[in-house]
Amino acid sequence: MKNRPLLRSLLFLCCAVYACGKSSNGPSTPVAPTSSISVSANDSLLTYPINMVFTQEVNTTHTTLISGQYADTSSKKGSLSIRLVGDTTGLFKGNSLFVTYTDGKGNVYYKTGDSTNFVQVDKFPKTYNGVVIGSFSFAVSSSAGAIRFSNGSIIAIYQK
């Protein structure tokens, strides 16, 4: 009789441990890291929610493409493409940096020869879904006008 409360306690403890046990519904699905490209463009703030990084061969030159865009379902239009010569961290300026910006009206802008144009890549893991981190500032122009991109930040996902 005296052991009955002890027995109930042990039974309750076993049930609690079993209920709190880890579920074995298979391995958890890894969550893809979030990405963002944000920049001040003249007097506006642009933020691209879909951002990816690719390494590509252009003719015989090894390049890195950093791409920012809106979702196909978004009412916002436009994109930003930054191409760098090489695939490493560091400061990219001059002929090692190419920029194409398309605004919401479809106007296409290209990097100017401004000597202050730069892209700084601080982190570049070359693994699938690795997070590439950097910053940038540059000017682009077209027949529609000129735009200064400043205080830009890159958090983009490496694809290949």
What are these regions (language model features)?
Residues 17-20, 42, 147, 157:
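Intrinsic disorder/low-complexity segments
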Residues 6-7, 48:
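Intrinsically disordered and other compositionally biased segments
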Residues 31-33, 76, 148:
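A short, structural micro-pattern
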Residues 2-5, 17-40:
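Bacterial Sec-dependent N-terminal signal peptides
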Residues 37-40, 44-129, 141:
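Surface-exposed helix/loop patches within compact recognition domains
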Residues 124-160:
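C-terminal or internal capping secondary-structure element at the end of a domain, subdomain, or sheet
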Residues 9-17:
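Bacterial N-terminal signal peptides
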